[in-house]
């Protein structure tokens, strides 16, 4: 066993969390999962590093425990993995990694997607102060944990009508390399994905919205947000339109390809963004647990309904013209 494989196996064996109660989304599981992904041992999950791969494998191990179908690479023996290797020549390890789990629905022609990015900024020896590890607890270990826990909750229910893809992308911090690979080589035609909810920075409440509320980027662009809110989701419009968050996560390249794709967040512009101080100690776990739980029934409705969201007139994103 080479060093990289040994580190991967050791860390996952130390931190893997068993689904003690697979039907409920509990704070203790969220603490364990986020505590692993944002631990110093994970060295900031730098894009394209062995630690990003460990994060991908860990998330895949959770998906496996919930009974999801693997949607990643197939090895020479024909065995399917939850992890998808994406060659990247400029990455430290020569690749980045996505994790894909599938909850198969009864209608093979339609799917929804729940996604996040699993990487962060790694280690920066030039950073001021003693802490050089950018743990990325909020950005975006919190989003990855939301995907894990929604997989837990949804897999424990009845088989949905629409297939649900649970996807954690690698190298978002390096320009969305993982999501680009997914879009260019999707496991299902993009026309069959009726909606994607990307989860980004859900670890702390945003004081600009009501208590217990999450916000949706591009809320005014499509019929998805209002309809989810009508079915119980505590979702409101992004209170920071000047930040252009709709265009700043992995939802955007999907949206440019026609998928109704938005980001769910509660980021209140805290000062730990992209700093070594984005640590587990700053996470509001009761808020995060309530937030994830609040989305289970609305997502179940979306997975079982015949509602197909659409861009509102004049609101579909279009690529910027090249000069």
Label every model-predicted segment.
Residues 40-50, 87-89, 99, 128-140, ...:
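Second-shell loop/turn segments in exported
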Residues 271-323:
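His/Asp/Glu-rich mid-to-C-terminal helical/loop segments that flank catalytic regions of hydrolases
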Residues 7-18:
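Bacterial N-terminal signal peptides
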Residues 109, 159, 169-263, 267-272, ...:
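Metal-dependent peptidase/peptidase-like ectodomains
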Residues 101, 114-120, 124-175, 295:
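Alpha-helical metal-binding/catalytic segments enriched in His/Glu/Asp
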Residues 45-103:
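A non-catalytic alpha/beta surface segment that caps or lines the substrate-entry region
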Residues 37, 63, 90-127:
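Acidic/His- and Gly-rich active-site-bordering loop/insert found
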Residues 25, 29-32, 36, 50-65, ...:
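Extracytoplasmic/secreted proteins, especially bacterial periplasmic and envelope-associated proteins
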